[in-house]
Curated annotation (Swiss-Prot):
SUPFAM superfamilies in the record: Zn2/Cys6 DNA-binding domain
InterPro entries cross-referenced by the UniProt entry: OAF3, Zn2-C6_fun-type_DNA-bd_sf, Zn2Cys6_DnaBD
Protein name: Transcription activator AFTR-1
Signal peptide: none
Gene name, Swiss-Prot/TrEMBL: AFTR-1
Basic residues bias (residue ranges): 51-60
GO molecular function: DNA binding; DNA-binding transcription factor activity, RNA polymerase II-specific; zinc ion binding
Taxonomic path: Eukaryota, Fungi, Dikarya, Ascomycota, Pezizomycotina
Region Disordered, residue ranges: 50-89
Zinc recorded as keyword: yes
Record organism: Alternaria alternata (Alternaria rot fungus)
Function: Transcription factor that regulates the expression of the gene clusters that mediate the biosynthesis of the host-selective toxins (HSTs) AF-toxins responsible for Alternaria black spot of strawberry disease by the strawberry pathotype. On cellular level, AF-toxins affect plasma membrane of susceptible cells and cause a sudden increase in loss of K(+) after a few minutes of toxin treatment.
Keyword Isomerase assigned: no
Keywords: DNA-binding, Metal-binding, Nucleus, Transcription, Transcription regulation, Zinc
Length: 445
């Protein structure tokens, strides 16, 4: 009579053959025929085990067992042939030992002892059952929750210091290079000595309303003429250092700019806008008394730097999502700064047209040449003709780059109510257009 497994239970074969079981002898469990059946020259059959164990907890596993029973219903498990297939327990693996004819069933826990890294238990169970595994459940696994799982050793050359990648938790809690805490300005007391003219001149205006005026320093701090500020600029002033100094003076040594007005005007906005702070910073520098002295011209490299700052502020304002409703006061401030830059570039164009060498010692290299009026490109020093040609092309490019910006400002000004401020902005934009065309025409002559 054919033995059948109980419903919802795994069907597995006996560990020993029927002949050894009836004889109550130990079977060596060789497949396809054990040693005793080979000596007796009789077929070695393995019956279905009567003790099948507990039913599986997972319903899909039980359904797979029932489907396997239906597929093998026509076959007699008692008379299984040596070449036939047999079903094994799900928690065992089939390992090959010795020659190709000898097979042994080994437990999975014993074979996994030699592994260097242990896999996730949830993933192993899903692979054994054969179900679709959701990798979101791996986040709850203790192995993946450890910080070592996300740390990797970079392949560094010999002698280099080994680095490690930070975990996502560390990256989320860290302060990036673009965060407000890192981008905060430096304090005013830590300014270098060459920025003293900015610190002392503006500090009294910033603190005059809340505290007594500070005693101004003598001429050691505040330069009395444009030649002194030019000398300070020659001592190693770089564009990045100047930007840090402007930040420190504008923010009054605070960690972050004041954005209360921006957030109050846009309460539903989650982004912080620094456009107004940048425009105030630029206007404070342009209107500095040392740069606005009569009968004096700004250095060419200073004018190029301010033109680059103006262009970047224009780009930020036009692309800012918070500043979608452009303020006429912001446009007026940008027009004033742009007019100052155009005046400086027009002075350079006028000097080139008249043949004068009043470029203020424009230099493009880190180590300037001995000649004050030469341009150093790497190790080469340009002569007068090449210097004039390069300067002319550079000024022409900078002037033409501001033309579409002024056209955009004119379009934004048309949104205004048509009051006195809107009319003033229209007049300033037209004046800047006229100055740009005049400078370009002067350079073409």
């Amino acid at each position: 009579m054919m033995l059948q497994c109980a419903p919802k239970k795994n069907e597995r074969l006996r560990g020993s053959c029927d002949f050894c079981t009836q004889s109550k002898l130990r079977c060596n469990k060789n497949k396809p025929s054990c040693r005793r059946c080979t000596l007796q020259q009789q077929p070695c059959v393995y019956s279905v085990a009567r003790r099948t164990g507990r039913p599986p907890k997972h319903p899909r596993k039980a359904n797979d067992c029932q489907e396997a029973n239906g597929q093998h219903g026509d076959q007699d498990p008692v008379t299984s042939t040596p070449g036939g297939s047999y079903q094994q327990q799900s928690n065992h693996l089939l390992d090959v030992e010795g020659d190709g004819a000898n097979f042994t069933l080994a437990d999975a826990s014993t074979t996994a002892q030699g592994r260097e890294t242990a896999a996730s238990p949830a993933l192993d169970n899903a692979l054994l059952v054969g179900e679709t595994f959701g990798f979101s459940s791996l986040l709850d696994d203790p192995l993946i929750q450890s910080d070592d799982f996300f740390s990797f050793s970079l392949c560094m050359p010999p002698g280099e210091k080994e680095g490690h990648m930070a975990s996502p938790r560390t990256l989320n809690g860290s302060t990036g290079p673009c965060s407000p805490t890192v981008l905060s300005s430096i304090d005013v007391p830590h300014l270098p000595g060459r920025f003293g003219f900015l610190e002392s001149s503006v500090e009294s205006g910033l603190h005059g309303r809340t505290r007594p005026h500070l005693v101004e320093q003598p001429d050691k701090t505040v330069p009395s003429s444009f030649s002194e500020i030019e000398k300070i600029y020659d001592e190693g002033l770089t564009f990045s250092g100047l930007d840090s100094a402007i930040n420190a003076v504008t923010n009054n040594g605070k960690g972050e700019p004041n954005i209360s007005g921006t957030m109050a005007a846009h309460p539903h906005s989650k982004r912080q806008c620094f456009c107004s702070t940048s425009m105030s910073k630029l206007q404070m520098l342009v209107l500095h008394p040392t740069l606005c002295q009569k009968n004096s011209r700004a250095r060419f490299d200073m004018a190029l730097f301010l033109e680059e700052v103006v262009f970047s502020i224009y780009r930020d304002v036009l692309q800012c999502l918070v500043c979608q409703s452009k303020s006429l006061h912001s446009l007026a401030s940008l027009c004033i700064c742009t007019d100052w830059v155009i005046e400086a570039l027009r002075d350079v164009a006028q000097d080139l047209s008249s043949g004068q060498d009043n470029l203020g010692g424009f230099r493009a290299g880190l180590y300037p040449p001995k000649d004050k009026f030469s341009i150093c490109v790497g190790r080469f020093v340009l002569d007068d003709q090449l210097r004039e040609s390069c300067t002319r092309s550079l000024v022409r490019y900078r002037l033409r780059k501001l033309i579409p910006i002024m056209d955009t400002m004119m379009k934004l000004n048309h949104r205004g109510a048509g009051g006195a401020l809107s009319q003033a902005i229209r007049t300033m934009v037209e004046d800047v257009h006229h100055k740009i065309e005049s400078a370009l025409g002067m350079m073409e002559l």
